[in-house]
Design a protein with these regions (language model features):
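Transmembrane beta-barrel strands of outer-membrane/channel proteins
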Residues: 62-70, 111-115, 184-188, 247-251, ...
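Outer-membrane beta-barrel "beta-signal"
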Residues: 400-402, 435-448
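Structural signature of outer-membrane beta-barrel domains
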Residues: 69-73, 114-120, 189-194, 250-256, ...
């Protein structure tokens, strides 16, 4: 659902909602009702099944979509690394997308624009888990200078993060014969990621218990941007009037992210009278530890983070005049996109979806569906700014078709993420990550 995950709303790849790694597959309201969209023929096919758009009736179709995501993300640091909890409940109030299809005879032209990945922002109160873990690592390092040295994490400001991968896809679909069609197009991607926050530490260089006061403050402020171009290929096969099979392949998109960021360490206090030499030695050690930490390092330097290729296959079957069954699967080639270690330790991700449409009458249709997402992430990949968690998604929706030229959808989905715990290079558990999302989708489609 992810295409995945997301980097979700920043701290989540994957996923702001669902998907694998930096992918978001929810591109319209109908997806929330039943995510098995690849085998359907409709305006949504501009994204999910482009080759299927040529099986629409002749005309110009425009579909407008809005998503509202109520997200709760939580990081619980293990006791030996600080034991604090950090939570973000900042919603993504409006995530829009649009699909346009022009069908003429045996050919159609399609366009989709929306958030292909990322999908929002997060705000963690009292910093993030990495600040505590870094504090413990600094503590261990300073004890190498003197066993009496101690470091205490005093807390942090609200950490703001955001991640948006804006995608525009357009192309052409062509019928080869009455049952088979092919499609091809280009995808343009622009990525924007931001992170800023503050951490405060007390350094006790005597080892004695003292009144906690800030004497080191660390500020990070970073923005990373990049763009890339990829392709999309697809086919649609309709062996009977009741059965439809759709296929889509999206190529890997090369994204070179340019970093505009800085890490500032502000020193206050007298450091227990240890003098300027010791102060500078300690502060330099703090700077070095922070800049070397994976969560911080990626925000301070240019990097290549490609969007993985993905392949999708789906089937829709009209069981009766009222009931249509749906199923589809997505596969993400994450390991192939690991050009410079950005997806180190990841496995490939996949999703399996099922759904059903039940037509009450000519105007009203009920929809329901389920999806399981395996993001390919694990305890060796989770970090504060990128934790793609496996998930179960349950969705329902209703479609209203007042006439042949208009269609409206309201949908709801609940995403139940499986908790994940990160381990460091020594095999010690550091942080447990949790997520929960409630999503509402609205769409309006018009035929001209």
């Amino acid at each position: 659902m992810k295409k995945s995950l997301v980097i979700l709303s920043l701290l989540a790849s994957a996923n702001a909602f669902a998907g694998s790694i930096d992918y978001l597959a929810q591109q319209d309201a109908e997806y929330f009702a039943h995510p098995a969209m690849i085998g359907k023929v409709g305006v949504s096919g501009a994204y999910y099944n482009p080759a299927g758009t040529v099986f629409l009736e002749d005309g110009l179709y425009v579909q407008l979509n809005s998503q509202t995501l109520f997200k709760t993300y939580e990081m619980d640091t293990k006791e030996n690394f600080g034991g604090l909890s950090h939570e973000s409940d900042h919603p993504s109030a409006f995530v829009p997308s649009i699909q346009i299809v022009k069908k003429e005879g045996d050919r159609s032209y399609f366009l989709h624009a929306g958030a292909a990945a990322g999908g929002g922002s997060v705000k963690y109160k009292n910093g993030i888990s990495a600040f505590e873990v870094i504090g413990q690592e600094i503590h261990s390092g300073l004890q190498g200078l003197s066993p009496n040295n101690k470091v205490h994490y005093l807390g942090g400001s609200t950490v703001n993060g955001s991640s948006y991968y804006i995608n525009t896809t357009f192309g052409i679909a062509q019928k080869i014969n009455p049952k088979f069609s092919v499609a091809g197009g280009l995808r343009f991607m622009y990525a924007m990621r931001e992170l800023n926050g503050t951490a405060s530490y007390d350094l006790n260089l005597t080892g004695e218990e003292a009144i906690k006061k800030e004497n080191v403050r660390v500020d990070i402020d970073s923005e990373r941007t990049g763009w890339g171009v990829g392709g999309v290929l697809g086919f649609n096969y309709q062996p009977t009037e009741k059965l439809n099979i759709g296929f889509k392949y999206e190529t890997e998109v090369e994204l070179n992210l340019d970093a505009d960021g800085k890490l500032d360490t502000t020193k206050t206090g007298k450091f227990n009278g240890k003098g300027e030499f010791i102060k500078d030695l300690i502060i330099n050690k703090i700077d070095g530890n922070l800049e070397a930490h994976p969560v911080i390092a990626e925000w301070l330097e240019d990097d290549r983070r490609n969007l993985p290729a993905m392949m999708a296959l789906g089937v829709s079957y009209e069981l009766t005049d009222r009931i249509t069954l749906l199923t589809s699967g997505n596969y993400y080639f994450i390991k192939d996109a690991n050009r410079n270690g950005c997806y180190e330790n990841y496995d490939n991700g996949y999703e399996i979806s099922v759904g059903v449409d039940y037509k009450l009458n000519d105007k009203w249709t009920l929809m329901a569906g389920y999806q399981y997402t395996d993001t390919g992430a694990n305890e060796n990949t989770y970090k504060d700014t990128d934790y793609a968690l496996d998930a179960d998604m349950y969705g329902v929706g209703v479609k209203y078709t007042p006439d042949e030229t208009k269609e409206f959808i309201v949908s709801y989905a609940y995403v139940d993420y499986k908790n994940g715990t990160a381990v460091n290079e020594k095999g010690h558990e550091t942080t447990t990550f949790k997520k929960e999302v409630n999503a509402v989708g609205l769409s309006a489609a018009f035929k001209f």
